[in-house]
């Protein structure tokens, strides 16, 4: 099993994570808290209350963990295509796989990534939702003092299953969406690359960016439910399950609730995924 795709996926995931984390923090807060009137209000209040560091809450853990999970996505995707088509990453430019095989490989990578990602993503979301200012008196210390303390607290208060809260919504978000993600990327690369050649850096940037936007537009409804399920249990159980969360959210806030954060997701998706694919493709070419 080639391991280059796993390593390239980890490094490219870290690059994308650093670029996108501030957007992700604002998005998560909009989806899970009702104290903000919109994107600008959330950005202003976060900066005023917590300084610029507030936008990077919860990032230290994903740098080591979520970036590693990204290696699972790219590694499983590439190796699934290898199993389906018997062609390596470089050979696929001369012998392009079918879009059906690309979709299957993307869904497989998305499914396995979701299960690996669930505990790490939950901890990230909990940390991002802490809105205490950095300089504060000792009597109002944040609930979680860091990722390790957060994980230990969840295990103690909610049990092992607490770390996988919202995992079904995460699976439903990532499995078909990441199939579409790779289909969009490969389709755009083929459209603007001469047959048998590698796509240019500009093509990779544009294809990766639009693949990210397309996938997040379809993923946002389950992303909202995922974030709300992950915050459930922090102050008592509010939802009886994923379907109850969907029904309750719709009943209280209308259909628009399922698209909270979509503008931010789309704005974040282009630069993050453009950088992710560019670094991924560059590393694979460098090593081969």
Swiss-Prot record:
The chain crosses the membrane at residues 6-26, 58-78, 102-122, 166-186, 202-222, 266-286. This is Solute carrier family 25 member 45. Belongs to the mitochondrial carrier (TC 2.A.29) family. Widely expressed, with highest levels in testis, liver and kidney and low levels in brain, including cortex, cerebellum, hippocampus and hypothalamus, and heart. It is a multi-pass membrane protein. GO terms for biological process: transmembrane transport. Solcar repeats lie at residues 1-83, 97-191, 199-286. GO terms for cellular component: mitochondrial inner membrane; mitochondrion. The keyword Transferase does not apply. InterPro entries: Mit_carrier, Mitochondrial_Carrier, Mitochondrial_sb/sol_carrier, Mt_carrier_dom_sf. PANTHER family: MITOCHONDRIAL BASIC AMINO ACIDS TRANSPORTER-RELATED, SOLUTE CARRIER FAMILY 25 MEMBER 45. It comes from Mus musculus (Mouse). Keywords: Membrane, Mitochondrion, Mitochondrion inner membrane, Repeat, Transmembrane, Transmembrane helix, Transport. It holds the Pfam family Mito_carr. It is found in: Mitochondrion inner membrane.
């Amino acid at each position: 099993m080639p391991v280059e795709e796993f390593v390239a996926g980890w490094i490219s995931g870290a690059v994308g994570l650093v670029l996108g984390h501030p957007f992700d923090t604002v998005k998560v807060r909009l989806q899970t808290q009702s104290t903000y009137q919109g994107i600008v209000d959330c950005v202003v209040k976060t900066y005023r209350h917590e300084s610029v560091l507030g936008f990077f809450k919860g990032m230290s853990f994903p740098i080591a963990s979520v970036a590693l999970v990204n290696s699972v996505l790219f590694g499983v995707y590439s190796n699934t295509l290898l199993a389906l088509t018997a062609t390596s990453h470089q050979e696929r430019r001369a012998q392009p796989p079918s879009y059906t095989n690309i979709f299957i490989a993307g869904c497989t990578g998305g499914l396995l990534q979701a299960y690996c990602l669930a505990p790490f993503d939950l901890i990230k979301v909990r940390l991002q939702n802490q809105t205490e200012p950095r300089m504060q008196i000792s009597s109002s210390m944040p609930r979680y003092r860091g990722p390790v303390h957060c994980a230990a607290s969840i295990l103690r208060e909610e049990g092992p299953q607490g770390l996988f809260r919202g995992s079904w919504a995460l699976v439903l978000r990532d499995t078909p969406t990441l199939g579409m993600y790779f289909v969009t990327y490969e389709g755009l690369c083929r459209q603007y690359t001469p047959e048998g050649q590698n796509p240019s850096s500009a093509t990779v940037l544009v294809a990766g960016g639009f693949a990210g936007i397309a996938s997040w537009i379809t993923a946002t409804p389950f992303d909202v439910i995922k974030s709300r399920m992950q915050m459930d249990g922090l102050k008592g159980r509010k939802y009886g399950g994923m379907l109850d969360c969907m029904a309750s959210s719709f009943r209280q806030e209308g259909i628009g609730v399922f698209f909270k954060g979509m503008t931010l997701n789309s704005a974040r998706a282009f630069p993050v995924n453009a950088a992710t694919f560019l670094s991924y493709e560059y590393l694979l070419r460098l090593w081969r």
